[in-house]
């Protein structure tokens, strides 16, 4: 394959979920410096739930988004700084502030059937001259054909790249292939596509490779898989795999290996891996960032986190419904009492 893959690192955004948004300024600078030296194309920086995600519902961050972005801007020389915005959490004013702090790429994220709420934010990002990306979360919850319709909306608002986002880590290679084929058949050939995987079924790397085989241009990954649930496609693993395939990625594998093991892994207070709870996320098709919230609720109410996660999947809960985790826990407790 001749084309150069665009490597988009998400350690400093999705990775926030893995440590409940508690990166220090020193942490983000150490990680960003290592990524920059390894020559990734972009480094996404924000609270795990995007600009202004720091809240009672999602969890408060150790710092503000702008403090993290400015800290990364101070040390990065090669990579573009990206950020994430969920309409309804972040506003265009927050986006302007992030731009002023150094962000030049924005991924505007909606649930996979709600692209229409991204119009204002995508149009505003384009007016700022930002690299503007549409990000369709929980892409497993709609059909490939319907996903393509939503992607087309984002394209019409001005997105120059649209992502298939497997937020639940619930898709297999056939699911990914079908969605990229649908997007490629619907979008303008000039519009890029991207893949954001989660590793809950251990398919993060495989799914990303299949996406590229179907014409995907940009791939999200994180050092040591640092991300919600069982994490994202581990960056160093993905790079090693595609290098063996002879694909052009432009990054330094050995620097990534060192950064993953020496800088990122020691920060994990809960191992980012496939285990009983994170496997349940992928099996039940649940939003990966529900993991830590569900574990807290399970401890509080004397339940199993797996039971909470499976019930959330049955109820088809989506990102933004974190408050329902406690409701589900209380319902399970009631059911237990009546059993």
Curated annotation (Swiss-Prot):
| Catalysed transformations (reactions) | (S)-4-hydroxy-2-oxopentanoate = acetaldehyde + pyruvate
Swiss-Prot/TrEMBL GO biological process terms:
catabolic process; L-leucine biosynthetic process
- Give the residues the record marks as binding substrate: 13-14, 167, 196, 287
Say yes or no: keyword Metal-binding present.
yes
Binding positions (Mn(2+)): 14, 196, 198
Q: Which UniProt keywords apply?
A: Aromatic hydrocarbons catabolism, Lyase, Manganese, Metal-binding
Q: Which InterPro entries match?
A: 2-IPM_HCS-like, 4OH_2_O-val_aldolase, Aldolase_TIM, DmpG_comm, DRE_TIM_HOA, PYR_CT
**Claim: Plastid is one of the keywords in the record:** no
Q: Cross-referenced SUPFAM superfamilies, in alphabetical order?
A: Aldolase, post-HMGL domain-like
Gene Ontology molecular functions: 2-isopropylmalate synthase activity; 4-hydroxy-2-oxovalerate aldolase activity; manganese ion binding
Q: Where is this site: Transition state stabilizer?
A: 13
A Pfam family this chain is assigned to: DmpG_comm
* UniProt family annotation: Belongs to the 4-hydroxy-2-oxovalerate aldolase family.
Listed HAMAP family: HOA (MF_01656)
Q: What is this protein called?
A: 4-hydroxy-2-oxovalerate aldolase 2
């Amino acid at each position: 394959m001749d084309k150069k893959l665009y490597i988009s690192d998400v350690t400093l955004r999705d990775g926030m979920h893995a440590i409940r948004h508690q990166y220090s300024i020193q942490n983000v600078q150490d990680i960003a410096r290592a990524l920059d030296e390894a020559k990734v194309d972009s480094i996404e920086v924000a609270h795990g739930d995007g600009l202004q995600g720091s809240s009672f519902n999602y969890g408060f961050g150790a710092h503000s988004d702008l403090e993290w972005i400015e800290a990364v801007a101070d040390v990065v020389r090669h990579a573009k700084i990206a950020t994430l915005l969920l309409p309804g959490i972040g506003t265009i004013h927050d986006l302007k502030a992030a731009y002023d702090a150094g962000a030049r790429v924005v991924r505007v994220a909606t649930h996979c059937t709600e692209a229409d709420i991204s119009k204002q934010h995508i149009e505003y990002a384009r007016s700022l001259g930002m690299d503007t990306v549409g990000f369709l979360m929980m892409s497993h919850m709609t059909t490939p054909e319907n996903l393509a319709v939503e992607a087309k909306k984002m394209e019409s608002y001005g997105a120059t790249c649209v992502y298939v986002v497997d937020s639940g880590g619930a898709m297999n290679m056939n699911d990914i292939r079908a969605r990229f084929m649908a997007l490629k058949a619907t979008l303008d050939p000039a519009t890029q596509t991207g893949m954001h995987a989660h590793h809950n079924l251990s398919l993060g790397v495989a799914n990303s490779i299949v996406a590229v085989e179907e014409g995907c241009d940009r791939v999200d990954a994180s050092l040591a898989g640092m991300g919600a649930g069982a994490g994202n496609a581990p960056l160093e693993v993905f790079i090693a795999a595609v290098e063996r395939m002879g694909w052009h990625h432009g990054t330094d594998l050995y620097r990534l290996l060192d950064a993953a093991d020496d800088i990122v892994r020691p920060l994990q207070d809960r191992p980012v891996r496939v285990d009983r709870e994170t496997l349940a996320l992928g099996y039940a098709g649940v939003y990966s960032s529900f993991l830590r919230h569900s574990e807290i609720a399970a401890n509080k109410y004397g339940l199993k986190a797996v039971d909470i996660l499976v019930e959330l999947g049955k109820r088809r809960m989506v990102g933004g419904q974190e408050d329902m985790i406690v409701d589900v826990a209380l319902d399970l407790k009631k059911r237990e009492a009546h059993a």
